[in-house]
Amino acid sequence: QQRFPQRYVQLVITVDHVMN
């Protein structure tokens, strides 16, 4: 049972890449 959905995690990763 994951607290954060995988799609949310992928979105955060994408935003992190864009910010970086």
Swiss-Prot record:
Localisation: Secreted
Biological process annotations from GO: proteolysis
Note from the entry: On the 2D-gel the determined MW is: 43 kDa.
Transmembrane segments: none
Top class in the EC scheme: hydrolase
Name the UniProt record assigns to this protein: Fibrinolytic zinc metalloproteinase
Cofactor list: Zn(2+)
Residue span, Peptidase M12B domain: 7-20
KW Coiled coil (keyword) present: no
Free-text function comment from the UniProt entry: Hydrolyzes alpha and beta chains of human fibrinogen and human fibrin. No activity against the gamma chain of human fibrinogen, human thrombin, bovine serum albumin, ovalbumin and hemoglobin. Has anticoagulant activity on human plasma and protects mice against death due from experimentally induced platelet thromboembolism with an ED(50) of 40 ug/kg.
